[in-house]
């Protein structure tokens, strides 16, 4: 298992209930270890994932599939 992190910028502010629902959805995706929103900026999401099982691009695709416009932030 190789753990990697990705920072996702979601184009709109995400309310608390929507944050919870998106985090719960992503926790069910094979290879995602820990999705979490920034406490200070509710449009930024950090996702720890097993890069042997999934990729940042696949995570972004899953977020798009939930109806969010988002991009990977290079850090």
Predicted stretch roles:
Residues 1-12:
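Short glycine-/aliphatic-rich beta-strand segments at the starts of folded cytosolic domains
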Residues 3, 38-43:
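Short Gly/Ser/Thr- and Asp/Glu-enriched loop/turn motifs at secondary-structure junctions
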Residues 8, 43-48:
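A generic structural motif
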Residues 14, 23-38:
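Short acidic amphipathic segments
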Residues 21-28, 58-66:
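Short amphipathic alpha-helices in soluble, non-transmembrane regions
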Residues 35, 66-75:
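Conserved short beta-strand edge segments in small beta-sheet-based binding/regulatory domains
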Residues 49-54:
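Helix N-cap motif at beta-to-alpha junctions
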């Amino acid at each position: 298992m190789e753990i990697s992190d990705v920072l996702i910028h979601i184009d709109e502010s995400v309310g608390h209930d929507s944050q919870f629902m998106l985090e719960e959805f992503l926790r069910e995706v094979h290879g995602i270890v820990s999705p979490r929103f920034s406490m200070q900026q509710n449009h930024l999401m950090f996702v720890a994932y097993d890069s042997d099982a999934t990729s940042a691009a696949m995570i972004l695709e899953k977020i798009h599939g939930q109806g969010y416009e988002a991009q990977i932030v290079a850090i």
